Amino acid sequence: MSTLGRSKTPSRDEPKKPGVFEKLSGTLSRKKKAPEDEHGNQGGAHHATDEDEVLELELEGREALDQSLVPVLARNIWLEEGEIRRYLTKETARDQKLAQVVDLLIYWLNEELADQRIVVRHLQEDLFDGQIIQKLLEKLEQIRIEVPEVSQSEEGQRQKLQIVVQTANRILGQPREQEKWSADLIHQKDFTAIIQLLVLLALHYRAPVRFPDNVVANVVVAQKEHGQVKTHRITEQITTVQTELAPKGTRDAFDTLFDYGPDKLAHVKTSLLAFCNKHLNKINLEVSDLDNQFQDGVFLVLLVGLLEGYFVPLYHFNLQVQSHEEKVKNVQFAFKLMEDTGLEKPRSRVQDIANGDVKSTLRLLHLLFTKYKHI
């Protein structure tokens, strides 16, 4: 665990969209294949064994994710008799979407635990003993997890971790013993087990991050039997389609509209679109997509100013947004302007708007509509 500076919000790879400035102004390298011998065999007299493959996967896979996962540890490479270990395939270790998931999880953990001076740098190295997971659950659930005093013995660590994992499973509504992220796997620093548990926790607590959709991890499972390493491959689902970011709470009209009223929802969107354009047209701007055009905060800042009867100077916010951080700053500025008008605190969160959560965006616009619909 490190106590260095906090991580910045990770940015997502997004296609560059045209800004509104013009309108406002005036209108890992792969190894070479071994040569074949005269019998068609590669690499000399012996074929690569399963154990060689496991060793190579451990070295190359971890190297590919070395910005957020621990360096290779010699004790993880060599299997004891009967031992089972899981390794990411080289292709999975180089998957940019998986790297995004790791970065987003680290960002979320550091944001949540900043007040406890905890900074996560490597998911496996920092979380395998369960202490950080315990701190996270205690904060978010406002509970105290009764665990034995800190033990230096491996068995003591496992017992403590077992209690923490069982608590997480109870909160998530999972079986008491969930084999996908068992205490044994997490204590082994199994990447897939740790990340699957963290993703479910992030979704359960509506973390203000949006994961890439449908990320999978291809995993090699290695087991040593009678002195020989046998392997097989499995695929583990890391993320699916993330439908909502907003925190859990009392259901409102928008929850009902999204669940049961697609026709009425379309009508509400049409009304909000007309409301926004009625005011944005005053400065030759127009919105066509409520779902996406407010997430960078530009239209939101300008709209709040127009509703209050003033034009927000362009140097007060980022007009041509280049990064996720600039989106967040713009939306934060818009929230500050709304607060200054005496508007009630929005249920939507800044990060939810910047991440493009549709329900949160519509809730916020409806809040403005309710106050300013007669202007």
Curated annotation (Swiss-Prot):
This is Paralyzed arrest at two-fold protein 6. Expressed from 1.5 stage embryos, mostly within the muscle cells. In adult hermaphrodites, expressed in the attachments of other muscles, including the uterine, anal depressor, anal sphincter, and vulval muscles, as well as in the spermatheca and the distal tip cells. Expressed in mechanosensory receptor neurons ALML/R, PLML/R, AVM, and PVM. Localizes at body wall muscle attachments. One of its GO terms (biological process) is muscle cell cellular homeostasis. Belongs to the parvin family. It comes from Caenorhabditis elegans. May interact (via calponin-homology (CH) 2 domain) with pat-4 (via kinase domain). May form a complex with unc-112 and pat-4. Component of an integrin containing attachment complex, composed of at least pat-2, pat-3, pat-4, pat-6, unc-52, unc-97 and unc-112. InterPro entries: CH_dom, CH_dom_sf, Parvin. GO terms for molecular function: actin binding. Involved in the regulation of cell adhesion and cytoskeleton organization. Component of an integrin containing attachment complex, which is required for muscle development and maintenance. During embryonic development, required to recruit cpna-1, unc-89 and myofilaments to newly forming integrin attachments composed of integrins pat-2/pat-3, pat-4 and unc-112. Also required to reposition the integrin-based attachments so that they form the highly ordered array of dense body and M-line attachments that are characteristic of mature muscle cells. The lineage of its organism: Eukaryota, Metazoa, Ecdysozoa, Nematoda, Chromadorea. Keywords: Actin-binding, Cell adhesion, Cell projection, Cytoplasm, Cytoskeleton, Repeat. Its main location: cytoplasm. Disulfide bonds: none annotated.
